Amino acid sequence: MVLLVQCVTDRDRPENGFCRQRVAALDRGARSWVPRSSPLPEIPPSRGVTAGLTVLGPGRALIEDGGGEEPERSWFTADGGRSWRTVGRRTVGITPVIPAGAVLGTDCVPPAPEPVQECARERIVVISPEDGRRRALARPPRLGDRPRPAAVAEPDGSWWVSGRDPVSGRDAVAFSRDGGRSWTSSVLPSSPAVGSLPPLWAVRVAVGPDAVYAAEVGELRGGEPGKNPMRALHRSLDGGRTWTRVWTTGPVGEPRTITGLPVPGPAGRVTVHGERAPYESVDGGRSFFPAAGGTSWIRRTGIGLLKEGDRCRYATTRDGVRWSEFGLACEDSLPVGG
């Protein structure tokens, strides 16, 4: 399921403009997207879109709207968007396991400040595919006050979280292959200049057919600045227990940025989509050359890695090599699938 926003404007009378917020669903085995009901109201174009849709497994999704000056509201569906019911957004209770279809996030460790501006400490929460409610994970990995979980599981069923090693204070990642009941943590190899750089913004992990890749995202020193700077790329051949730093970004050379996740393929192949172009490696990330294709944002979904390119063009891959393209909300075909 996806959330689509279509706006109608009137240049002569801007107050007549409106944006319709709709849901489209691609049912299992179907060849095309179909419109479904949405609990969201029409909004004026000047307000901007504040809603987001989170898929929680087949036929299940959560819509969250509001924040800032707008009231917070949430709705959950378990029947593919045919009906929606209101759910609360606050974290309620604890869960010992991350169920299939769940999505991970964070919230403030109680007591949280009111209004919430910045948490002193954050915790990992599980958005349940059963009811769309948030519950704190009972046994999270020990990765400091700002754990950063990947939203969804990797293809092998593993869940990943990045943060700070509590002993050394260095950047680290942890994975679980038993639904969050236990975690294995490892420290990432530090750059020689790590002490002179600000803290990382994030570590983005992608599991491939024969290796795991972890991209460090954070401010660079020297060279042309970017909005999504990649400091380094690490590779693991033992499922994330140990790491080798294969790429360190310098003042020149590409890739210097990464839009979303690295795309791992077989036999040492990995692609990094930068802000200007994609770059491919066939030696496990030690060297890169320009690849075909335009700029894209890469993220993990339940159907593989999703490439979001131009306004209405998308593609998915399960092996990092073959991509299945489709259009969604294109002007000449609204909506379509393939």
Residue ranges: model-predicted function:
Residues 1-338:
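Extracellular glycan-interacting surfaces
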